[in-house]
From Swiss-Prot:
Self-association state and partner proteins as the record states: Homodimer. Interacts with TECR.
Lumenal side: 2-27, 94-115, 163-171, 228-236
Keyword tags: Acetylation, Disulfide bond, Endoplasmic reticulum, Fatty acid biosynthesis, Fatty acid metabolism, Lipid biosynthesis, Lipid metabolism, Membrane, Transferase, Transmembrane, Transmembrane helix
Record: active site: 150
Disulfide-bonded cysteines: 99-231
Role description: Catalyzes the first and rate-limiting reaction of the four reactions that constitute the long-chain fatty acids elongation cycle. This endoplasmic reticulum-bound enzymatic process allows the addition of 2 carbons to the chain of long- and very long-chain fatty acids (VLCFAs) per cycle. Condensing enzyme with higher activity toward C18 acyl-CoAs, especially C18:3(n-3) acyl-CoAs and C18:3(n-6)-CoAs. Also active toward C20:4-, C18:0-, C18:1-, C18:2- and C16:0-CoAs, and weakly toward C20:0-CoA. Little or no activity toward C22:0-, C24:0-, or C26:0-CoAs.
Record membrane topology: Multi-pass membrane protein
Annotated motif Di-lysine motif, positions: 277-281
Stated name of the protein: Very long chain fatty acid elongase 7
Side Cytoplasmic, residues: 49-72, 137-142, 195-206, 258-281
Amino acid sequence: MAFSDLTSRTVHLYDNWIKDADPRVEDWLLMSSPLPQTILLGFYVYFVTSLGPKLMENRKPFELKKAMITYNFFIVLFSVYMCYEFVMSGWGIGYSFRCDIVDYSRSPTALRMARTCWLYYFSKFIELLDTIFFVLRKKNSQVTFLHVFHHTIMPWTWWFGVKFAAGGLGTFHALLNTAVHVVMYSYYGLSALGPAYQKYLWWKKYLTSLQLVQFVIVAIHISQFFFMEDCKYQFPVFACIIMSYSFMFLLLFLHFWYRAYTKGQRLPKTVKNGTCKNKDN
């Protein structure tokens, strides 16, 4: 009886919570419930931390050079497209970069922003291949807590962003992240091409700095919300989450920077058989 009562209360709470969801995205892939993505991400964590390494234990590493070249440059092009769409659906045509609320209308611009948010969300599932490539190539030392946590938490939390607030000030970090990914995955793609391209990769050391700057800019932007008395942004909880994430990842990447560069405990060279070692964002 107690379990049945708890279940009914849980269902009631879920129904009350989900009624505020954006009806425009209800029928989009993976958007009906958080359960499918939770199962997918749970299996991802299990595969990259346990099942995958066990399956590869007595096997030779896969040679995935062509696959990684194709994948990395695909992400570059996809990121360019998403960045452009974020600009053309709000950030370059009317957003103030301060208190930008979500437009829930079905106007072409509002729907374009919602679709771009979903594309960004879906891109995070594509990027799970980063870790799967590590596992298949037996580069298990690269499957770090920072890497797996980042690749898991981003799509999971972005489901809620798309479901409830596909637009507005909560999407600025996505715009910035797509721009950063253009640079990062360009580097990864060039690295995968082999040693002949090493002379063009002198800017490797600036990648972590770029990531750190990204988190600082996101924190500065979202912090404005807490100092604007009349901002009508519909989901303040997302502003709190974004602020928390920006500081959390800033600290994690600062720790990485300190360990890899300041203390001299640098990770192995970036390119070896066409892979990038420091792929944590």
